[in-house]
Amino acid sequence: MKRLLDAHVSIYARPLVTWYYTPMMLPFSRHLDASAVVYDAMDELSKFKFAPEHLLDLEQELLDSADVVFTGGASLYEAKKDRHTNAHCFPSSVDRKHFSKARRELPQPADQADLKHPRLGFYGVIDERFDIDMLRQMADMRPDWSFVMVGPVVKIAEEDLPRAANIHYVGGKTYEQLPVYLSGWDVALMPFALNESTQFISPTKTPEYLAGGKPVVSSAIKDVVRTYGHLQGVHIAHDAEGFVHCCEKALEQSRDPNGDWLAEADLILSASSWDTTQARMAGLISQVLGEDISQEAPALLVAAE
């Protein structure tokens, strides 16, 4: 991997910016002579199930060498800001043009087309962050609702997944397909468990679901509550009964797609574009480099997950 990386970097002009999403990339990239080192912390990876034991040591090394730190949400910023003098908070952004396609009536994919309404959906990785017991209880309480689960199942045994006639696992889908599935839902769900692995998350699903014109029902994830909890179209639930109650209110909103709840959400989304985020990040990196990279970027190495 190191030889491949060196060969790749050798073809680019300087300056070189190394951009890390995870400290696990350090062992084969720490030798690079970078003009700027960016640590883009999107999750508290050490809290995830099966996290490598040496992850925390590598993260400290990355924090020591980084010139600037970006954090994906307020909770993560609070966890990192005292560990680096140049840390900045970037709440979830959204590609409104892409996800707003879901506001139109789109031809439905075969694995969703025949599912009865109301449809309540989730997309994303189904792992230890997902509250499978919550899903099981909701499906039992409302057998007339269809629960559509889009995404790969990871770190959860097949036999532990809740199974019911109204729970539908349709597997992982591409980014391009997500608005199509979203368009066929009545309510979008974020039934996250409240545990170590969700303590610092700031789900990008929240603005994506809203951009798709769907009311959202979520567990009480800290960054969701404080960033979106005041919106009429975002409902916060604390248990299965609360989830069902919130979903009933959200279903009423879904029947009024031009209601005040969506106009209110759109106002928030208007300031949440990835272009705005990119421009702000580029400005902070420019300060490190001492040159403007907003128009012509330097050689960028993305040391990704």
Predicted regions span which residues?
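Nucleotide-sugar-dependent
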Residues: 130, 176-181, 188-210, 217-229
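C-terminal alpha-helical cap of glycosyltransferases
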Residues: 274-305
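Nucleotide-activated donor-binding/catalytic signature segment of Leloir-type glycosyltransferases, i.e.
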Residues: 156-182
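Conserved acidic donor-binding segment of nucleotide-sugar-dependent glycosyltransferases
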Residues: 233-241, 249-255
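A charged, aromatic-enriched C-terminal amphipathic alpha-helix characteristic of glycosyltransferases
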Residues: 255-286
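Conserved donor-binding/catalytic core segment of Leloir-type glycosyltransferases
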Residues: 111-130, 135-139, 147, 270
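Carbohydrate-associated surface elements
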Residues: 75, 90-102
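Membrane-proximal helix-turn-helix segments that form the acceptor-binding/catalytic region
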Residues: 4-7, 52-69
